Amino acid sequence: KFTGVVLGLSGGIDSALTLAIAVDALGSERVEAVMMPFEYTSELSMNAASKQAKNLGVAYKVIPINGIYSSLMSALKPEFSGLQPDVSEQNLQARARGVLLMGISNKKGLLVLTTGNKSEIAVGYSTLYGDMAGGFNALKDVSKTLVYKLARYRNCNSIEQDIEVIPQEVID
């Protein structure tokens, strides 16, 4: 039995809209957001995720994936030896995040929300057992263009107009 939801909050538009939908549907007390930065995660993304979580009053934590990624790369070093870096290394980042979210889900009884939109899913811009790992996707039938429109709409229709539900810098 799930008592709430957890999602990876990247500081991007898709996870930001998913978080807003989850809070609208369940209330902030039943939603957890996790930022899982890697060495290339921008300060802008970190700040946007933190700001939105605070604005919406959800439980928020930061779990860096650098150590997990390094361990995976060490374990795979014999297999990757002599091969050029490619999308495989990027997919390991997504899969590390998926493992962390599933661990939180199992331990706390929270449903993992995935955040990919219909456009990304249609063209295969996602990672199996990574950002696709979860129990429900609120944006599964929402195109990327509509994601932006919904984000703007949600911000314009906030009960508390002085609080951005989705940080404007994420929409821009």
Task: Show where each model-derived region lies.
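Phosphate/ATP-binding catalytic cores across multiple sugar-kinase/actin-like superfamilies
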Residues: K1-V6, L100-I104
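Flexible, glycine/charged-enriched surface loops at secondary-structure junctions
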Residues: F2-V6, Q161-Q168
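Short glycine-rich phosphate-binding loop at a beta-alpha junction
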Residues: T3-L9, L111-T114
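ATP-dependent adenylation/pyrophosphate-handling site
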Residues: V5-L9, I13-S50
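Flexible loop/turn segments at secondary-structure boundaries
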Residues: I13-L17, Y40-L44, V62, I68-L72, ...
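Short, glycine/charged-enriched secondary-structure capping and boundary segments
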Residues: I21-A22, N47-A49, L76-K77, S126-G130
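Active-site adenylate/phosphate-handling loop in enzymes that bind or generate adenylated species
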Residues: L26, L56, E79-E160
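A conserved beta-strand->alpha-helix junction
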Residues: R30-V31, M35, E43-S88, A94, ...
